[in-house]
């Protein structure tokens, strides 16, 4: 028998739907800061945070997490992705995303990296309107 597929949006930061139930980790931009400061140990910190999150999710019955955000941000003009992205630098964002996915996987949780490439360049919130990227 297979366990039920139960997913949750638990990125850290303000997209944490288990507030008060699970450990509150910072937004994913902290992962980029850690990796930029020290690549090897930064990636391990990111992996361990995702692993800890994954273990808590498994304990709560979740088998799937909608995280991490793999897209890059354009910074303050980006109302949707912003601090949910590890970095404006694609290489840093890729390293952070890979480390997080490995951590979730090690905890036995399926990870969905999101959002569509380029979403971080949108200047309107996709929850409110259809962004147009040029």
Residue ranges and their predicted role:
Residues 1-93, 115, 120-134:
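Enzymes and membrane/adaptor proteins characterized by extended Gly/Ser/Thr/Asp/Glu-rich
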Residues 2, 87-110:
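Alpha-helix-loop-beta-strand connector modules within alpha/beta enzyme cores
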